[in-house]
Amino acid sequence: MYPENYKRFLELIDKLREFEGALIVEGLRDEVALRNLGVRAEIIRLSRLPLSEVALIASSHKEVMILTDFDKKGEELAKKLLNYLAGYPCSVDIETWKELRKLVRKDIKGVEDLYGLYLRVVSVSDPLLEGIQ
């Protein structure tokens, strides 16, 4: 990731921390990484349930954020989830995933790697980034 993107990356991490809806991820390691980042929202893992059931559980929240991995498989899962969630009255955030993917996909492949990338960014951050954590 280019240094000029560090600030936006950290802002997106803060957005994840502050999110109060349901976050949909692929697996346990993704959930662990998000918890390490300080995310407190309910996390629903795709590895445990069929997509239709995940969508039903997630739809009980007003807001749902899709946070699949940043590879081709993750992109396909995100599209399928959007289709499943389209029939429910919840608000679905896919834009955060798209922006994160654009920023990090050359550095990492999955959500499970976000915490490690976060630690690297914070360790090399300059004074302009102080206060954003």
From Swiss-Prot:
Protein name: UPF0292 protein TK1411
Signal peptide interval: none
Cofactor(s) named in the record: Mg(2+)
One Pfam family here: Toprim
Domain of life: Archaea
Metal-binding recorded as keyword: yes
Biological source species: Thermococcus kodakarensis (strain ATCC BAA-918 / JCM 12380 / KOD1) (Pyrococcus kodakaraensis (strain KOD1))
Cross-referenced PANTHER family: UPF0292 PROTEIN MJ1624, UPF0292 PROTEIN TK1411
